[in-house]
Amino acid sequence: MEITDVRVRKLNEEGKMKAVVSVTFDNEFVVHDIKVIEGQNGLFIAMPSRKTPEGEFKDIAHPINSDTRNKLQSAILKEYEKAKEQEAAHKE
């Protein structure tokens, strides 16, 4: 399964959530609402989730192995950095 498109839909400068992203796989399947989060050890992605009646958050969709997660995170963070640079250029 190949990542064929990454769209940064919303950028935030303040707070820990830095962006909301949609990723398309094989030009056939899209996952919306992946979040770019700033943590203690740098940026990471959080998959879309829902809150259970018990107050826990459960992922709706997620990679099932670390190689796929790393590939997905790398692609998303690369596009996030590009979007940040473009936004900064528009502000100048």
From Swiss-Prot:
UniProt keyword Electron transport present: no
Entry keyword annotation includes Nucleotide-binding: no
UniProt-listed InterPro entries: SpoVG, SpoVG_sf
One GO BP: division septum assembly
UniProtKB keywords: Cell cycle, Cell division, Septation
Pfam families, per the entry: SpoVG (PF04026)
Family: Belongs to the SpoVG family.
Function: Could be involved in septation.
Name the UniProt record assigns to this protein: Putative septation protein SpoVG
Gene designation per UniProt: spoVG
